A protein has these predicted regions:
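Catalytic-domain carbohydrate-binding cleft regions of carbohydrate-active enzymes
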Residues: 1-242, 246-247
């Protein structure tokens, strides 16, 4: 862990974890009908066939919020279709209300939604009304939205398992004929339906990005305004929502 040293062959910790994951999923499948889901802290080449993992011990910062999306999209391309991150950050300072709100808003549209922290950092959902009263109603709204998206996530999970299409993926995956998507590091596609342009800077009042999909009509999920794909757009941003677009 933490890449402090290169392990010797007599200490193949990651390979051991891989064998444990494989054994566990085989045992579950032999005793239980239906889908099985395993979360593992360690992994090795081929883990995507048996278990899922997360981005690791991130810190409570805007930079972590920004780059977790890049990591998750890359993990999706590697077959880890249910990857997630510790929303709010695992270690470091307690996230302020705006950072936690933005992280939750973004996390709703990731495969694995988990608010998790270390020791005395109070980010647990049952504490938000006390620890983050300023944005509690907005946090509550997005937590409810995540619940409403469960059927969609189940559908996309099945599709990803059967066809290998990542749930969370870079925009270039879907729009390879549009050069503007080649350098889109932070915007991403979430399943068949959503395009997400997350907010990863404090006190953000506007967001400019390329909306892919020439010939596609996108609908802003919250304002219901329609936009044509294949163009650069700029939106005014408030604290109540983030740029999320849907297509039919």
């Amino acid at each position: 862990e933490y890449c402090r040293e290169t392990p010797a062959t007599r200490r193949p910790h990651q390979a051991q974890g891989h064998e444990m994951e494989m054994s566990l999923i085989m045992a579950k499948l032999s005793h239980e009908a239906g889908a099985s889901w395993i979360l593992s802290r360690s992994g090795y080449s081929g883990i995507q066939k048996y278990a899922q993992t997360w981005t690791g011990d991130n810190n409570s910062s805007w930079k972590s919020l920004q780059y977790d999306n890049t990591i998750l999209a890359s993990m999706g391309l590697s077959g880890l279709i249910h990857a997630g991150c510790d929303i709010g950050g695992f270690w470091g300072e307690t996230p302020d209300s705006e950072l936690l709100l933005r992280w939750i808003q973004n996390g709703v549209f990731t495969p694995r939604f988990c608010i998790h922290s270390y020791k005395d950092i109070p980010t647990e959902p049952d504490l938000h009304e006390v620890t983050h009263p300023k944005h509690f109603k907005s946090i509550q709204k997005f937590m409810q939205l995540r619940t409403e998206l469960i059927p969609y996530l189940e559908e996309q999970s099945k599709l990803a398992s059967e066809q290998g299409i990542p749930i969370m993926r870079p925009t270039v995956y879907d729009f390879q004929d549009e050069p503007e998507t080649y350098n889109q590091s932070f915007e991403y596609i979430f399943g068949d339906k959503f395009f997400i342009a997350p907010i990863y800077q404090p006190e953000c009042t506007s967001r400019e990005f390329y909306l892919p999909g020439k010939g596609i009509t996108w609908t802003h999920y919250f304002t219901k305004e329609e936009y044509q794909g294949g163009q650069q757009i700029s939106l005014d941003i408030g604290l109540e929502d983030i740029p999320v677009f849907t297509r039919d």
